[in-house]
Amino acid sequence: MKQNIKKIYEIASVATICTALFKKGLKNQFIQGLSPLNKNISKMLGLAYTVRYIPAREDLNLIDVFKDPNHPQRVAVEECPRDYVLIFDSRKNPRAASAGSILITRLMVRGCAGVVTDGGFRDSHEIKNIN
């Protein structure tokens, strides 16, 4: 994101941005019902890098799939560009654990601007204390 654009978004309210998008014909460009784990962070800003989860088949989603370095979750964590926000679309299912403290810490170390999910996080008590 260009620095001049970023500065504009840093001072704009979410309502103002949503109204501007609405005027451009983009409706419902936000996820309802979200709340920050870390209440001390005032605003998160970055372009979106999105991962969409689909329901897992119990016969195919064995624990071994998570050892694969090409697993979509691992690839997303490693490919999410610096200063982007990683968005996990979990179909609003809180049982879909989008990530845990290890992957969130990895994203932070890699320079990710933040993480959003409409599902759940494992280790949320640890994630909220990551600085």
Cite the ranges covered by each PLM segment.
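Feature captures the catalytic cores and cofactor-binding loops of soluble hydro-lyases/lyases
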Residues: 1-131
